[in-house]
Amino acid sequence: YGVVAQMFAFLIPAPLLLFLTGGRNYTFARTESRYLVLACGLILLTLITFSLVYAALDIKPSQLAYLDMKDILKNKGAFLFLTAIIVPAYEEWIFRGLLFGILVTESTRRREAVFATIFVSLLFTAVHIEGAHSLSALPPIFAMSIVLHLMTWKSGSLWPSFCAHSLQNLLAASTMLAAAAKSAAR
């Protein structure tokens, strides 16, 4: 229940943040399709880069996260929907929509936006520590967050970051399901 508790911990102040910002944040506004393609491509490039670095250094992510997943195997569709759609939409709205939107406005200087990106990316990474089960998973999460922020800032919309985040979570969830199925078969 750790991840669910974290989500609710962020959900409680979210309406207050929305009210206090007067709607001054990033939303799921229309955006150019090139930003969607670019965001997904950058996330895939980030994942491939970290996979190659980890393979070269013989770093293996912890399998602990996959061993407790027998219940998830009972309802794969709900797990994939929650992981690939609901969680990314929620996290994008909270981290890039509200928090980043509060810190970065149209008049924000580039340097301030970089600091805001790093700060919110550190928060995003911190929220994912419990689910990572390995310190080696944190650098890719941080890098992914930086990429998602840049896409949101450049496009002015949450759609590119949501699509890229959904793709990343779908790949991770599929890997988890495959590992859980393999572990359950033993």
Predicted regions and their residues:
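Structural signal for the C-terminal ends of transmembrane alpha-helices
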Residues: 15-25, 151-155
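Helical transmembrane-bundle signal
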Residues: 10, 47-48, 124, 169
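Hydrophobic alpha-helical membrane segments
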Residues: 9, 46, 143-147
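Alpha-helical transmembrane segments in multi-pass membrane proteins
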Residues: 1-21
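Transmembrane helix-loop-helix hairpins at the membrane interface
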Residues: 76-186
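Juxtamembrane helix-loop-helix connectors linking adjacent transmembrane helices
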Residues: 1-2, 21-87, 105, 180-186
